[in-house]
Structure formats: C-alpha cells, structure tokens
A protein has these predicted regions:
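S-adenosylmethionine
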Residues: 2-214
Length: 214
C-alpha cells in the first residue's frame, strides 16, 4: 500500500538525496498516482515499482537496510473513517488478507540485509493479520527478531495470549486504538535481522573491490 505516496515522500525527504528508495504498490492505477506524487515532491533517488513482491525479491535479495511494509489488510481500524470498508470486509475478511500478508512479510525479510530493520504495519485489529502474522514470520525466519518500539501516550502492547507469543516477545509490538489516542486503529511491529558478521550488501562490496583494483 505505498500509494498515494505520503509515506514514500516522507521517507524520501529524510533520505535527503542519499541512498535509494524503492517503493512498490501492486496496483498499476495506484502506482501511477504514487509516481506522480514523488515527482511533484522532487525526490530524485526513488524507484517506483508496481509488482508482486515475490517477483522483486530475486533482484533485491538481502539488499535493503530498512524496509517498511504497509500491508494490505481488512481495514478494521478504518471503519469509523469510511463505512464502505465494512462492505469490503464482509466480502474479503481477515483470512483473505492474512495469506497475502504472510507472503509479503516473508519476502520482505528475504530482501532485508543482515543487521537491517523492517517495520510491519496494518490498520486492522484482527489478531490473524497482526500477532499471528508476526508469529508466522518468526517461526519461518529464525534470523528475524522483534525489537522495542518507543511508546507514546495511547500506545498499547500487542497481545500475548499464549506462551509461544510471550516467548517471542510480542509485547514489543504496538497496538493503537482510536479510543486511546487521536487517529485510527493500527498495529506495528519492528524487526531486526541478525547479522552474520559479513558484508551484507553484496552489490556494494563488489563495487568497492572494483574501485580498489583500478
């Protein structure tokens, strides 16, 4: 859900012309709006993509030092803002989106370099899309682990409703409820990939060696 571009333009501004920002929205029509907005904001170091993450991963394996996943979700946290989302939820509920999210989060972990950080975010209350998706990642990618998120007034810890989630430290995830702070409902989880002690950005290492041989 990179479009329409609010998060991408904010990240691009923080990069201040350094590095590379790759932003992806699988919807072609939404990606066009995304492209227009990053152009309007004058971000020079951005690469806009409209593709299934699985098709991107081979070209960016362990490439990124930071990844933001604003996952497609059932939107339960947005019902108060947009009643139309209730009808959409009735057609495609949490089960539909959980499968998509699990594919995306695993692919994201594969594109993260060792020592890198990845933020997973939804705007839903569903445990299936939130805590259970985090569980799925931690079981299938043991090199990933949760790290603390700074709490602000109104933040609540994620649910730890069984021993496995407690052992995985799901209390480090954050739930945001609209009755506790201004805004809509959200869930966020911050991960770090264990470092193997080697240069993770393989492409950078190759370029560096080539420069030294000249």
């Amino acid at each position: 859900c990179a479009a329409p571009g609010g998060k991408s333009t904010e990240l691009g501004a923080k990069l201040n012309g350094s590095g590379l920002l790759v932003t992806n929205d699988i919807s072609n029509s939404r990606a066009k709006a995304l492209l227009k907005n990053v152009e309007v904001f004058g971000i020079p170091n951005v690469y806009v993509v409209s593709e299934d993450p699985k098709n991107i991963q081979p070209g960016f394996n362990e490439f990124f030092d930071k990844i933001l996943i604003d996952a497609p979700c059932s939107g339960e946290g947005m019902f108060r803002k947009d009643n139309k989302l209730i009808k959409s939820w009735e057609k495609t509920g949490p089960e539909f989106y959980a499968k998509i999210q699990r594919d995306i989060i695993l692919t994201g972990a594969d594109m993260l370099k060792p020592g890198g950080k990845m933020l997973y975010s939804t705007c839903t209350f569903s445990k299936l899309e939130d805590e259970e998706t985090v569980r799925h990642l931690l079981i299938n990618r043991p090199d990933m682990h949760l790290i603390d998120i700074k709490h602000y007034d109104g933040f609540s810890s994620g649910f730890t409703y069984d021993d496995e989630l407690k052992n995985m430290h799901l209390e480090k995830t954050v739930r945001i409820f609209p009755h506790k702070m201004e805004g809509e409902g959200h869930f966020i989880a911050l991960f770090e990939k264990k470092s193997d002690g080697e240069t993770p950005f393989k492409g950078h290492g190759i370029i560096h060696k080539q420069k030294n041989t000249k």
